[in-house]
Amino acid sequence: MYGITGNGYRLVSSYSPKGDQPKAIEQLVEGVQRGDRWQTLLGVTGSGKTFTISNLIAQVGKPVLVMSHNKTLAAQLYGELRQFFPDNAVEYFISYYDFYQPEAYLPALDKYIAKDLRINDEIERLRLKATSSLLSGRRDVIVVSSVSCIYGLGSPEEWKAQIIELRPGMEKDRDQFLQELVSLHYVRDDMKPGPGKFRVRGDIIDLVPAHEELAVRVEFFGPEIESLQTFDMQSGEVLGRDDYAFIYPARQFVAGEEQMRHAMLAIENELAGRLNELRGENRLIEARRLEERTRYDLEMMKELGYCSGIENYSRHLAGREPGDRPHCLLDYFPEDYLVVVDESHVTLPQIRGMYGGDRSRKTILVEHGFRLPSALDNRPLRFDEYVGLVPQVVCVSATPGDLELEYSGGVIVEQLVRPTGLLDPPVEVRPVKGQIDDLLGEIRKHTARGFKALIMTLTKRMSEDLDDYFRKTGIRSRYLHSEIKSLERMQILRELRTGEIDVLVGVNLLREGLDLPEVSLVAILDADKEGFLRNTRSLMQIAGRAARNSEGFVVLYADVLTRSIREVLDETSRRRKIQQAYNEEHGIVPQSIIKSVEQVLNTTGVADAEERYRRKRFGLEPKPERLLSTLIDTLTAEECYSMAESLRLEMQEAALKMEYEKAAYLRDEITKFEHRANEAGKGI
C-alpha cells in the first residue's frame, strides 16, 4: 500500500508512481514551490495523470480547485480523488440544475421565454458543503468543479458573517435562534425535516444543516443552550454529543437586514432612472413591463428576504459598482490555493467563451424591459478576470492548446511513459483511392484477433452509409453521432465492449470518452481535410483511443500530407522512441488492459436497465409492476437519474401530443426512479 501523509493531506493508493510519473511529480512540485503561476502537464492517454496530480496535491499541501469542462468528467474525478484522499475534504461543485432553460427574449418572434429549471437537491447540498468546507478554515480541501465556479455566488464575507455558532452553556434565546434560522432560509417542517429544514418540540430544536445529512439537536434550558447532539433524523439514533456546531446558510445568496434594505433602495433608484430613460424614448411597453416585474421582486424581497431570480440583483446585494466582477467560488478559497485545469485544451476555451454568450442573451432582456441594466453584472467571469484571480495553475492535457502553452511560457512537463508499458500506436498514411476496401481488410484482420475498431468520417450521412455497407459485407457495425439519444449511445458502447458489435462508425468520437482497451484499430477517413476534427490535436486525441491496446494501430487515409498529419507523425514517432527506450531499459513487456465482461456491464449497466425496463413496460414480460419494482431496486443512483431523464423527455413529448394519460403514467414512473435514486445516493 502506497501513501503520503503530511501537509494536511493523506494520500492512499494500492500502487506507487511508475513510468514518467515520479519525474513529472517532482517537476510539478518544484514549479509550485518555486512560485510558477502556470505549468502544463502533457500526459498521454493512460499515463495516470490523475494519480500524478494527487501526488502533487499531497506534497504541496494547498487547498485545490480541480476544473473540468463537463459534469460527467467532473463526477469521475470526484470519485477518483475521494478514493485517493479518504480522510480529507474532497468536495463537488457543479451546476445544481437537472434542467435549466435560461430566461430569454426573441425579438424577431416577440416571444419571451421564462426561466425554467429543476434543482437537484443533492447537488445543491454538495455545493453548500463545498463552500462550507472552504470557509471552515480547513487547508485540506479539494473542490472538483465544472465551469460553474466562475459564475456569480453570494459574497463570502457576508455568507461567513451569517454563520451561527452554537456551544453548550452559551446564552441564546430560543425564539431569537428560530428567527436566525429563518433569516438563513431554513424552513420549518415539523413532519419531515431534511437538509435546510428544522422542527420545534418545546425547548428542543432539531435541524439538518443545509450541507449535511445528519441532524443537530439543540436543547435549551431557559435562556441558554443545555446540550448539542448529532443524530440520524431517520432512525432517531443519537450518534454523539458535540462541544460546538456551526450552522451555515441554506442558500448561496444571503444578506443581512441592513444590507437588504440598502440593496432594495439601490434597486428602487436604478428602476426610477431606467423608467425615465425608457419613457423618454417613448418605449412605454418596455417601461410598464420592467416596473411590474421589478416591483413584484421588491415586494417578495421585503416579505421573504428572497425572490425568484434574486441573482439578477446581486450587484446591489453585494454593494458592487457597475461593471465590477461578481463574487464566485474562487473568492471562497484562501489566497494561496492551487488550480488544476483538467483537459485544458477544452476547458480554457470554454471559460473564455462563457462571458460573451451570457452577455448577449441578457443585453436583449435589458433592452426590452425584462431586466434592469444591473442584471448584466450577474455574469460569469471574463477570461482576463479569471487569469487575474488564480494564483497558481497546473493545466493537464494529452494535447495542450495554445492558451496554456502561452501562459506556461512554452515550458511543459511531459508524462509520456505509461506504467503499463504500452506504446503510442503506430500511425500510417494511406491513399484515399480504394480506402473503403483497404479499411475492410484492416477491420477483418483486427476483428479476427478479437479486437474492435473505431472509424471516423466527415459527416453523419457518411457514417450511416458506411455502417450500412459494413453490415451488408458481414461486419457487425453500428454508427454513433449527435442525433442518437444519450441512453442509446450508452447501449451502443456496451454492445461494443461486450462483443455484440465489432466496429463503431462516427463523426466526432472524441466527445464520447471512448477509452476502450478492446479497440486496436482507429481509422480516419479524409484525414487531409483540415478543420476542427482534422487538426493536430483532434488527430492526436482520436489516435490515443488505440493506446490502451498493445496491438493498437492508426490509419490516416489522405492524399495530401497536411501540416497536421506531419505533426502527428513526428510527435508519435518521438513518443514511441522514448517509450520503447524506457521499456527496454526496465525490461517491461507492454500488455493491454483487459476488463472482464462483469466489469464492462457494471460500467454500462444503465443501458441494460433501459432495455429490461422497456420490455416490462410494454408488457413483453408478465406482472410489469412487480418486475419493475425488482428492477429499480438493483439500480444505482446514477442509473436511476439517467432513466428518469429519459422518461421525462418522453413525458414532455406525450404532453405536447395531448396524450395526458401516458404523460401522467410517465410522471409516476419518474417519481419512482427519483425516489430510488435518493435512497441509493444515501448509501454511497
UniProtKB/Swiss-Prot annotation:
CDD domains the UniProt entry points to: DEXHc_UvrB (cd17916), SF2_C_UvrB (cd18790)
Motif (Beta-hairpin): 96-119
InterPro entries: Helicase/UvrB_N, Helicase_ATP-bd, Helicase_C-like, P-loop_NTPase, UVR_dom, UVR_dom_sf, UvrB, UvrB_inter
Gene3D superfamilies given in the database record: P-loop containing nucleotide triphosphate hydrolases, UVR domain
Residue ranges constituting the Helicase C-terminal domain according to the UniProt record: 435-601
GO molecular function, one term: excinuclease ABC activity
GO biological process: nucleotide-excision repair; SOS response
Pfam families: Helicase_C, ResIII, UVR, UvrB, UvrB_inter
Sequence positions that bind ATP: G43, V44, T45, G46, S47, G48, K49, T50
Subcellular location: Cytoplasm
Domain Helicase ATP-binding: residue ranges: 30-188
Protein family membership: Belongs to the UvrB family.
UniProt function note: The UvrABC repair system catalyzes the recognition and processing of DNA lesions. A damage recognition complex composed of 2 UvrA and 2 UvrB subunits scans DNA for abnormalities. Upon binding of the UvrA(2)B(2) complex to a putative damaged site, the DNA wraps around one UvrB monomer. DNA wrap is dependent on ATP binding by UvrB and probably causes local melting of the DNA helix, facilitating insertion of UvrB beta-hairpin between the DNA strands. Then UvrB probes one DNA strand for the presence of a lesion.
Comment text on domains: The beta-hairpin motif is involved in DNA binding.
Subunit structure: Forms a heterotetramer with UvrA during the search for lesions. Interacts with UvrC in an incision complex.
NCBIfam families per the UniProt record, alphabetical: PRK05298.1 (NF003673), uvrb (TIGR00631)
Record protein name field: UvrABC system protein B
Species lineage: Bacteria, Pseudomonadati, Chlorobiota, Chlorobiia, Chlorobiales
Gene name, Swiss-Prot/TrEMBL: uvrB
